[in-house]
Structure formats: C-alpha cells, structure tokens
UniProtKB/Swiss-Prot annotation:
It comes from Caenorhabditis elegans. GO terms for biological process: homocysteine metabolic process; methionine biosynthetic process; methylation; tetrahydrofolate metabolic process. The gene is metr-1. Catalyzes the transfer of a methyl group from methyl-cobalamin to homocysteine, yielding enzyme-bound cob(I)alamin and methionine. Subsequently, remethylates the cofactor using methyltetrahydrofolate. This is Probable methionine synthase. One of its GO terms (molecular function) is cobalamin binding. Methylcob(III)alamin binds at E699, G772, D773, V774, H775, D776, S820, T824, A876. Residues 1-327 form the Hcy-binding domain. The lineage of its organism: Eukaryota, Metazoa, Ecdysozoa, Nematoda, Chromadorea. It catalyses: (6S)-5-methyl-5,6,7,8-tetrahydrofolate + L-homocysteine = (6S)-5,6,7,8-tetrahydrofolate + L-methionine. Residues 913-1249 form the AdoMet activation domain.
Amino acid sequence: MTRSSLFEELAEIAKERIMIIDGAMGTMIQREYMEEEDFRGEILKDHDKPLKGNNDLLSITRPDIIYKIHKLYLEAGADFVETNTFSGTTIAQADYRCEHLVHEINYQSALVARRACDDVGAATGRRRYVCGAIGPTNRTLSISPSVEKPDFRNVTFQELVKAYGDQARSLIQGGVDVLLVETVFDSANAKAALFAIRTLFEDEGVPEMPVFLSGTIVDMSGRTLSGQTGEAFLVSTKQGKPMAVGLNCALGAKDMRQFVDNMSKWSDSFIICYPNAGLPNALGGYDETPEEMADVLREFARDGLVNIIGGCCGTTPDHINAMYKAVQGITPRVPPQDPHAGKMLLSGLEPSIVGPETNFVNIGERCNVAGSRRFCNLIKNENYDTAIDVARVQVDSGAQILDVNMDDGLLDGPYAMSKFLRLISSEPDVAKIPVCIDSSDFDVIIAGLESTQGKCVVNSISLKEGEEKFKERARIIKRYGAAVVVMAFDEQGQAAETDPKFEICERSYRILTEEVGFNPNDIIFDANILTIATGMEEHSNYGMYFIEAARMIRENLPGAHVSGGVSNISFSFRGMEAIREAMHSVFLFYAIKAGMDMGIVNAGALPVYEDIDKPLLQLLEDLLFNRDPEATEKLLVAAQEMKKDGKKADTKTDEWRSLTVEERLKFALVKGVDQFVVADTEEARQNTAKYPRPLNVIERPLMDGMAVVGELFGAGKMFLPQVIKSARVMKKAVAHLLPFMEIERQANIETMGLAEDESPYQGTVVIATVKGDVHDIGKNIVSVVLGCNNFKVVDLGVMTPCENIIKAAIEEKADFIGLSGLITPSLDEMVYVAKEMNRVGLNIPLLIGGATTSKTHTAVKISPRYPHPVVHCLDASKSVVVCSSLSDMSVRDAFLQDLNEDYEDVRQEHYASLKDRRFTDLNKTREKKFKIDWDKFTAVKPSFVGRREYQNFDLNELIPYIDWKPFFDVWQLRGKYPNRSYPKIFDDADVGAEAKKVFDDAQTWLKKLIDEKILVANAVVSFLPAASEGDDMHVYDPETGNKLDTFYGLRQQSGREHDQPHFCLSDFIKPLKNGVPDDYLGLFACTAGLGAEEYCKTLEKNHDDYASIMVKALADRLAEAYAEYLHKEVRTTLWGYSTNEDLTESDLLSIKYQGIRPACGYPSQPDHTEKRTLWKLLEAEKNGIGLTEHLAMLPAASVSGLYFANPQSEYFAVGKIDQDQVIDYAARKNVPKEEVERWLSPILGYDTD
C-alpha cells in the first residue's frame, strides 16, 4: 500500500495557518434559479422521473455552473472545495432512477472541481485542493424506518460498503486530493464508508490518500441522529485513520462550539468545523451574516480549537471570505499527542475508556444463550422484548460492557445476533455501553459487527487453526474497528499452565502488533480461568497459573489487557453460593493486583475482601495458592458450619457497655440499639468540661456515630432497615437534648436580646407528598436517610398544597425542597409547584421522587419550569448524594454541569423519540382489536347482582395471601438471582440476614396489629349487567335494565407487530344481544388501612420511624392480600365462574387463574378519572374508602378495580397513544381535550407544550 505525499504537505500547511474549506453548494445552486431542463440536459431529456433538485446531476448537465461556484469559493479564500457529489451513491440516486450515472456523476464532478482548483491555483500561486464529498445517503443502519419493527433496516452494511466503494473509486479516478465523509448522522454508515475506503487502499492497490471525517450533532443534546455523543462518534470511526475530524451542518457556529471543543480535546487529528449560517428561519432560510459567523469562528481559532473552518447550509462566498480574513495571523490548533495513550477506547452511544486508572471492568454475562437457559429460551421463542430486559438489567446492575452470545445449534446465529443488536440500538439505556460480540462462529461475529454503530469487542479469536487464519480474521476485525479478545489457545490446544499461557499470548501479541498492525491497547487476552478443587491434583494450581500469567502479560506485553470468566474458578463448589462468592472475591483480589483488569463476573454478589471471616479467608487462600492438600475438605467442613450468607453467627455481648460514652453512643447508633441511648446522652451532656453546650453532644459524638452509619450505608455495608433503626436512636437522643437547648436559647435571648442563628446540620430539606396524593412510605424513608446524613428534615406529610410547601421553605430558610408522589396526577402537581417556586423567586434546588416519577419527566416537564437545580432522585441513597453534592461548594458546579448536560441529553432524546414514533391509526387499531367469537360464549351469572359490603374483615385470613416481595422492596432489600423472591431472599449472601430480621419484625408487628385491632379491613363488591360498545363498557341497572353509567376504554396504538391484536378492556365484554346486555362486569374496592394513619402519627411522635414505616408497609401488603382474597372468592363463589379452581398461594401471585382485575390509573386503563365512575357505582365512601381531589385512594393502603370473567381476558399495557385517540376519547367522555391530556400525560405519544 503506497501513501500519497499530500499527507505531509497538508500537515505542514495546517500547522502554519488555519485552512479554509468552501461553503454551501446547494445555497449557491438555488441562486441560479435553474429549471427542470437544466437538470436533464441532453443525456436525460427523456428520463421518466422529475430531476429538478438532483443537484449532483449538474456536474454532467451544467458543469459551467458548478465550475463557477467552485471558482467563487476559491477566489473568496478557500483552500478546499468539495465535489458536487453529496448524493453521489447508487443508494441516494435510486430515488431519481439515476443509479446508472453514479460513476459519471462522481468522475465529472471531480474533474470540474480539479479544473477550478488548478485554474485559481495557477492565477494566485497558492495550491488548492479537491475534497471528494461523500454524503450519508438517505438510509441509516442504526434506526429502523418502521416504528412497528424496530429491528428492520432498509439497507445493509455491505450494500453501503459497495455503494461507498463505487463512489470513492470514481472520485479518486477523477483526481480528488482528499476523501471527505461528511454530515455523518449515523456512525454505522460512516463505518461502512471507512470500511470501503480502507478496502480500496489495502486490497485494491489504490494509493492511500487523506481522509476527512465530519459528523453532525443534530441539536444541543450533543448527539448524532442515531444517539451517539461526539466523543463516541470519534471512537467508533478511529479505525478509518482520518487526518481531520470534526462537525458540520445542523447547528450554527455558536451552538456548535462546545461540541467542537470536546472533539478538540479528544482527538489527535486535525479539527475541521463548517457550521450552518445559524439556524433556519421560518421560511427555511439562514440569517447569520458573514461578519457574525466570522466573529464566532475567529474565537474558535483564537482559543485553539480548529485547524480547518468553512461553512455549510446557508453560507456563501461572502461568508467564506469573511472567515478567511478573520483568521489571518492566528496560530492554528496544535493536535495533542494521543490524549488516550495507553488506554483502550470503546463506545456504545457513549465512550468508554479502559486504562490504568479504570476500575475493574465488569462484562455483563446474562445475554448468552450458552450460559443462560432463560435467555436462550427467550431468543428461541423470538421473545426479544423480554430478552432486551435481560440486557437492561445487566446495565442497571453495573455492566460496563454487554457480552452477547447466540451460539446454539437450533438458532440461526447471524440472524439472532443481528436482530438482537439492532433492537438494543433503539434502547438508549442499554445501547449506551459497548457490546462484546461473543461467538465461536466468525459469520456470527461479522453479523454483529455490521449491526452496531459503536466500537465493539470481538470475543474471540485464537491460534487454534494456525497463524494464517488468525491473521486473516484479525485483519477483518481491525478493518471493522473492533477490539479483540484472544484466547490462550494454539494448535496444540488450551493452555493450562503459566508458561504455555504466556507463550501463546506473547506469540499472538507479536503477530497482531507487528504483522497485522493492531493497536496493542485493543488486545485483550483471556488467559483461561480454570476450575480448582476438582479432586484432581493437576488442577490444584490453576488459580495460581492464571494469576501469574496475568502478571507476565501486563509486565511484558505493553497495552494489552487481561480478562476471563471468574465463575469458572469455583465451579466445583456449585450450589454453595456463599463459598463461591467469597472465592471469587479472593481470586479477584489477587488477580487484579497481578493485572487482570476486566472480566465476566457478578460484581453485585462479591463480598468485600476485608469483610471475609479470617478463618474462611485463610482456607480460600490456601486453596487458591495450593498451600494445603486438605484445603478442599476443610472448606467443605467450614461450609457446613456457616450460615447460608457465609458469615459466622454473631454472638451477643454486653461488653460495649464498658466503653466510653462516646463509643457507646456510636455503637448504639450503628447497631440501632435504643435501650440506653437517653442515659448515655444525658451522661455526655453532663460532662460540661468536654461538651459545654447540649448542641456539642449532637455535633460531636452523635454526628460522629451517624457519619459512620452514612458511610456504611453508602458503601452497601448497611441496609435500609438498619439505617432507619439508627435514625430512631438518633431521634431519641436529640429529643432528650432539645429541652436543654431551648433553655439555653431563651437565656441567650434574655442576656443578648437575640437568639443565636446556628445549626449543626449540613442543610435543611422541606419534604412533602404533593397535594392530592396520600402515599408517603418512600418519602418517609428519604426523610430518615437524609436525617442520618446530617440534614435537618421538615416533613410536611401528605396531600400538601403548594402554598404550604413554599411557605415552609421560606420560613425554615430551606436549602432544598423535596416532592414525592405515587400516582400519575401528582406529576402535574409537581410541575405546578416548580412554576410557583419560580414565580415567588425561590432559587433553592428541587428534588423529585416517587414511584410514578422519572428522570425523563423531570427533565422534560419540570426542569424547564424552574431555572434552578431540579434533580430526580431514584431512591433514598440517591437523595443523600444529591443533597451532599449541592451543599459542597467544591463539587457543586461540576455536579450541576453534569446534571444539566445529562438532562439536556434526556430532553433531546425525548423530543427525538416523539418525532420518530409511529402510531397505528385509531380506526385501524379497532379493526385489529382482539376478537372473541361471541356466538360461542355464554356468560356465567354471578351469585348476586348489585352491591355487597364486607366490614371489619378478619386479617388473619389474609396472611396466606401476602406477597412479601414488595415488602422487601420498601426496605430496599433486593436479593440477587436466584434469590430475588420470597423466601429465597433469605439465602442471599448480601441481604439475606437483614431480610430475615425485618421479616421477623414484621411477624411480630402483624400479630400486634391484628391482636390489638389497630387496623380495620373493609371492602365493597358489585356485579352489574354489562355490554361493550366500541372501546367502552356500559353497565345496567339489574332491575330496570336502564343504563347506569359507562366505563371508557383506551386501545393499544403502538408497539404491536402486524399480526398482534390491539387490546382494549372492552374487547373482553360481550356487546348487546338483541338490545339486551348479556354479560357482567364486576367492581370492587377494599382497604386494610383504616386506623393506620392515626396509629403511625403516634409512633412518629415517639420518634419511631422504623415502626411507622413497618405499619404502613404491612397495611399496604394486607390491602393487596385482601384484593387477592376477594378475587379468589369472586372466581370460586361470588361470581362462581371458576368453581373448581385449585391453586396455591404461589399460583395466585403468579396470576395462573381465569379472569383479571385491572385498576383504573394503571396500564390496562391509565385514566385515573375512571375511579369517579367506580366510586359512584360502589358508594365506596360508605365503607370508609375515599378519593382525594387527585383521585388517590384514602387510606393509602387501598386497592380497587374491575373484575372480568372472560376466559380469554388478559392483562396488557395500553402504552403510548396518539392525538387522534385523545380527541376521540375526550369526545366520548364529553370533557375538554386538554383535561384528558392532563390526566393521560404519561402515555401521550406527542408533546403538548
């Protein structure tokens, strides 16, 4: 492969001065006012399609015009002109049926530009250069043109490679100096173009010439149309070896600056920047003047951001001339030496850096058909939606790279790999991280590489089939731009011992770096982690062999990385999860020290090395390093003596009572022991030599203890129930000190005339559940955790009007406001509070939390209404991080910058999704409704019609129906697979012990609540004749037959495959038969929360938050259990359509019964206003169950809904709906469209602002 001398020539000029590229070709063509015949010319005079607008044809039909435009730009000062070939591929020309002219278009365009450059160069004595313009085409590899089929693509990678190759070849034949791949909105398309160009250089003998690459950031999110950040775009395309990289189009110069700045820091190439002349005006024109644009780009130049500047849409020779003059004498940017030297760069939608300072990189392992039976079954059954959820869980659990393997004999591997990767590309929360394409079939690897826009890892290749095959595959991987995993495997087989492992890796490294030209930082060696303790002596050193091989690789093969499957080491102890997890921790401790920097491991299940019991640690290290031939047997014995979570049972002791008072207070706080805290606090207070003031006791020993609690919770070494118990201890101590502090305050007022204005807290947080919402368990937990972390919390309770929140914030001089809500109407109330905070002039941060909230809603709907920090807090620990970061002036600015950038990304992604989302027309969805053959259906008549009440129900009967998993979720105790559900959670290595403690507490409290009749459970059930009409369900008076009311339905409108029905609840109710209803609908409401609120207030007055949260959580579980019990009674007795049902409690919780009970305001009918009809028909208030103005149920521990008996009825989610359905729904309900939009805002598929 020969190399053009232009590299050195252009590099020298770009180091001396800022170079200029031309402006818009299309803008100048429009000024010529050409007609259809200009585009046809003689060659296309009889063409069967209109051609006006196909500007590339003008290089053939009107070359005089194109030459004139080139010359004007060159005379204005341009160093480079672009050929008139933006749409010069067979793919783009297919729209005009001009594919047959592609070679001529490109060849003639290059000749015209070449002649203009040569003519002006000769006249001015300054050489000019031709850039062969290669546009993005009108198709994209990363985005489906069909919303209904997100895996569909209307072009393949290889089709693009051929089209780009043909174009580049013709441009080169016409005499271009540079190939410019521009306006890249999808990095996958750019990768195809670069692949084609590298193929020309490396396989066809075309001399290598400079390549420029310019992406397009579509808006202020800083992302391309396909979702990548500018930095990720650079990483994805680095294999193309661009001499210059940068941005053009979409944005004006001012808006483009921050993104050019980022690229300038990231890239060691020259930086090119040619923005639009501002943003389009209402008429599609561009208003930024040459002087305005030149002034901005002059600042780019002065700040050392650019090497080449020019213009895109709306720019003219006058703009280029102004730029040329503006940068005269300014020293160009000096490209940095490789800013990421010694690091591996990968990318998904975002860049990922693996280097010396990077923590161990966790590779998610569950998207592997060979390693996960569940994932394999999902793929075989074409259940890709759920398979994507598996990937999402991996990312949410901390995977930094997603391993995907489709190697199964019953699968079409290339098809499955392509489909899965294409699907996850439309899931930003998954696609943000890089993919590891894992297969032993190279065709599957190629399919994967051609289905993702990021820089991937290929897993794997080896010397197993010899050097030639190894080099062939390595060169292909390199051309695609991926990193590679190399197995320690050669022609003789898999290496087990240290020296063979290293020898194979060293040989592979030499071939890759010296013969293939691989970047050593893109090489990952899997040095084979093999199982120890198998009973075979030759296996006993396998752990040491790997660790020593890792050390040798990192010390002797610069840049290379070491990876492996960690769980292999402990396979002989399968079934003993606590032992396995501890063994993984010990193995990684030493392997990472030796140089292993990435691997497949369940990081969430690793105990901290220092926390492993010393006797166990000794046994594990003896086993790992083969120091004791009986280590395996000893470990098996130890396992029998251990608790299932791998830790020795605690022994009770009162030795701590002999410690100093400070140590006793700390112990009480950390352990949650309140028995002696008042006495110990008083002892500390009386030591006035050490603590002159009561406040000093809070500031020092008590806060010191809570600091330990906060640290342990943040590190995952304490769990939420323990933290809440600690808070209870703290509150009791502070309550004891408050009267003494008040006496001191009054004394100060009398002697000094004023009270001291001081606080021991980090800050003050006013927190409330918003108006209309009664749910507060999550809010209460946040209050406790914030209090444990030295924040003063002013809790305003539930159903708090906006004016009360703002008033409290002003009176308390709050540093933060926190809003909580569970039901969707609360989202609108939060928007209103934000607006009011802005109106009254507050400038403190606003925290948003609760089950119905999301980062997207916060960023899109709330944040724009309040020009100060607005932060979505996912859970209690997140709120601490947010408040602490915003309180610490040393990190506040950086935190806010990251937050603002993140929320801007979220906003832009949201608006982009609205543009791209496609909906089925409402009438067509009704044609595709779920159809039941009503002629063959006979409804079962209930045992009674009308209304029936159930008062003061025996709670003991509900205990078997309790679903305990949500209970543990309240306490943020989440087991890891396979110990997620109850009772398996008790076996979880991390949370099992604490879950058992909380569960035992719950049993004690359940008994107390029932025995003392603290809680009361009531319910009301009704069965009414019913008939469907379209999407609605009418209910009738059982005596008169008159229509009583209507339940209105919403129908699925998006996300359905062509053969899938579009569900609506009315599909499960029979229409009128001969004008008479011939079916039934059930209605119910139940509660187990009567009495809970009053009792919890008493507990909170006694500073017992733990008990208060426990009571509310149990009331909630009992209410759900009551709903489950009632539904069983309905099925088997009250309605009696399933009299022979014989299901276990587990079957009930798994919904294995006939019929459904959807709730208003939830997925099958997301409209909360339907509760008004339900309440009117049930007269639920008579049973003590009410509705707030925002339609939350009161008490909070209440459940309501409808009963459907049809055997074909099933749960479904309506999902997003379009405006046509909203208009239709509003008309049917006879309410304003705006009111419907307010209540249905979370499911609207369009923006109402």
